[in-house]
C-alpha cells in the first residue's frame, strides 16, 4: 500500500526515466516534488504553476532541477489515468524548456 503522495512521486520518477531513455541529457536533471509552489507565480507564468525548472549552478554545485508541484497538478485530475497523463505532460514541458526544445520534440506522444 502506498500513499497518494508516494504514488505521485512514482509518476514523476517514471516520466523522468522514460524521457531519459530517449534524451540522455535528461539524466543530468534532478527531479523533485513539492506540495505547492513556494511563491506566487512570476509575471510570465500562468496563474497556477504546475512545475518549474531551475538551471544548473555549477559554482554552487547545484545540478539542473525540475520541481513538480503535487497539489496543483493533482487537483486537475479526476482519476489516476488523468493524473498520470498530466504528470507526464508537465515533466515533458519543463524538460523541453530546460533543453530549449518544443515538448513535441521531447515526447511526440505528449502534444496537446
Report each predicted region and the residues it spans.
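DNA-recognition helix of helix-turn-helix
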Residues: 93
Amino acid at each position: 500500500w502506498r500513499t497518494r503522495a508516494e504514488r505521485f512521486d512514482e509518476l514523476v520518477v517514471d516520466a523522468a526515466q522514460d524521457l531519459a531513455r530517449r534524451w540522455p541529457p535528461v539524466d543530468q536533471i534532478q527531479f523533485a516534488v513539492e506540495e505547492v509552489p513556494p511563491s506566487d507565480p512570476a509575471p510570465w507564468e500562468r496563474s497556477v504553476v504546475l512545475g518549474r525548472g531551475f538551471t544548473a549552478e555549477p559554482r554552487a554545485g547545484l545540478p539542473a532541477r525540475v520541481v513538480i508541484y503535487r497539489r496543483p497538478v493533482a487537483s486537475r485530475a479526476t482519476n489516476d489515468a488523468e493524473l498520470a497523463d498530466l504528470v507526464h505532460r508537465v515533466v515533458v514541458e519543463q524538460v523541453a524548456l530546460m533543453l530549449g526544445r518544443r515538448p513535441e520534440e521531447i515526447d511526440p506522444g505528449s502534444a496537446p
